[in-house]
Amino acid sequence: MGNELQHRTVLLDEAVESLVTRPDGIYVDGTFGRGGHSRAVLARLAEAGRLIAFDKDPRAIETAQRIEDARFSIVHDSFASMRDALAARGIEKVSGVLLDLGVSSPQVDDPARGFSFRADGPLDMRMDPTRGESAAEWLARASVQELTEVIRDYGEERFAFQIAKALVARRAESDRLGPLDTTGELAQIVGHVVKTREKGKDPATRTFQAIRIHVNQELADLQVVLDAALSLLEQGGRLVVISFHSLEDRIVKRFMQAHASAPAVDRRLPIRAVDLPSPPLKIISRQFPSEAEVVANPRARSAVMRIAERVTP
């Protein structure tokens, strides 16, 4: 319960107000977390409405199972499974999809989960600790090239190659020092390599972000769920996505723009604009947390919410 109290849902009212356009519709919360958005959606739904939520984190599932509401169900899986999971429930169309990306405060604040460089803990970083390869396991086998690519591409870290070499050098000392399996040591290694300091940011921030994204396949899953959401939305249905770093937001922005624009056609061809198929999406807005929300919850500072609506059947 303590962890739930520590988590403040970002852009709560704005997201739910943008999402729920039909109280008797079927909605999807792709990232249940500690249930802030889901509970607010349920409060707006009519008796005939339904909400299906997804989460990989077993602790999120435990929290969700305490919601006693016949309109609500939870799926213990990545939101990338959305299309198949809804099909298995006989659902072909939904009125809205909400995605609140990234890690939740309880995940970051619990050293045992291995997401944070601020407190020492096991080097795990999996959203679902019961499935897949942990960060420590991946670091124990990844090549310098793979490490460099992940840290550079997912962390936008300009010292990626130097960090990768340091990690592989540390691995060569495993017989003497034991495996690299704590967040504290990883942060220390990165701190020795990254000599420049960004104001208000720990030198390990970008590397931890990169490894977390890789371990959880976050960007690949995001692309899958955006495609699924587009096919699942009914006409008038809303896609609401909250991102917390530029990599996620760039994918969401480009996806919405691509599907809200008419297809490109060679001007030399005898085709009129009115004869082209209409784009399936209309971009509604982009929103940021208010100053008051950022003061109350500093982790909201980097959030950006994008909203699009399905305009074709």
From Swiss-Prot:
SUPFAM superfamilies: Putative methyltransferase TM0872, insert domain, S-adenosyl-L-methionine-dependent methyltransferases
Keyword terms of this UniProt record: Cytoplasm, Methyltransferase, rRNA processing, S-adenosyl-L-methionine, Transferase
Catalysed reaction equations from the record: cytidine(1402) in 16S rRNA + S-adenosyl-L-methionine = N(4)-methylcytidine(1402) in 16S rRNA + S-adenosyl-L-homocysteine + H(+)
GO CC entries: cytoplasm
Presence of keyword Cytoplasm: yes
GO biological process: one example: rRNA base methylation
EC number: 2.1.1.199
Entry keyword annotation includes Transferase: yes
Molecular function per GO: rRNA (cytosine-N4-)-methyltransferase activity
Residue positions binding S-adenosyl-L-methionine: G35, G36, H37, D55, F79, D100, Q107
Entry protein name: Ribosomal RNA small subunit methyltransferase H
Species of the source: Burkholderia ambifaria (strain MC40-6)
